[in-house]
C-alpha cells in the first residue's frame, strides 16, 4: 500500500514528518535535490537535510540529472525512504523522464517504499502537473513534451497556499483550475498523509 508524506515546506512540518517516520526501522533516506538545480534560492534543501539529520536519519544524495540510469536503478532498488525536494516541477519531471525512472519510483512506492515529497516533489505525485505553470516556469524544461506525472494521488496538491511569495500565483491557480481539477491547497505548515487511496491533511502545531 502506498504511503506518502506530501508537504509544501519540510522544515515547516518537522513534527509531522517525525510522526510519519516514527515507526520506521530504516534510518537512511535517499535524498533527491534535483528540482532545486535551476533555482537561485536553495535554502530549503539544506533545511530539509538538517531536519532529517536531527531526526537521526542519514542521507544519501541522488541527483537524478547527474547520475546514470543504471546507477539510479541500483540505488532505488535498495531505497526504503525516498525524499524528493522542492524547486521547479517541470525541470524535475523532465529529468525523471529523461532517465526513464518515473515508473520505477511508482512501482517502488506501490511495493512499500515510503515517499516524502516537498513542493515540486509533492506535485509530481498527481496525474498531470500542467496546473502548476502559474507558479513554476515551464520554459526551464524545454525537453519536456508532456506533463503526465506519477498519477498516484486523486488530488492535485497546491503547495504554499497564501504564503509569500506565492500568494498571487496560488490564488490564480485556484481561479483557473479550481473548477476543473480536484485541487488540494496546503500552507507551509500543513502536510498530507497518504495511505493507499485515503489521505488526511494535518497542521504542524510546532
Feature roles, as predicted:
Residues 151-195:
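Conserved anion/nucleotide-ligand pocket segment
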Residues 8-10, 190-191, 195-198, 202-206:
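Patatin-like phospholipase A catalytic core
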Residues 89-99:
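Glycine/threonine-rich flexible loop motifs
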Residues 42, 102, 106-163:
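Class I SAM-dependent methyltransferase SAM-binding "motif I" and its flanking Rossmann-like core
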Residues 56, 79, 112, 153-154, ...:
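Short, well-ordered alpha-helix to beta-strand connector turns
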Residues 90, 122-125, 191-193:
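Short, active-site-adjacent cap segments at secondary-structure transitions
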Residues 37, 87-90, 121, 162:
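Short glycine-rich anion-binding loops that position phosphate/pyrophosphate groups of nucleotides
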Residues 1-81, 85:
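N-terminal beta1-alpha1 cap of cysteine-dependent amidohydrolase-like domains
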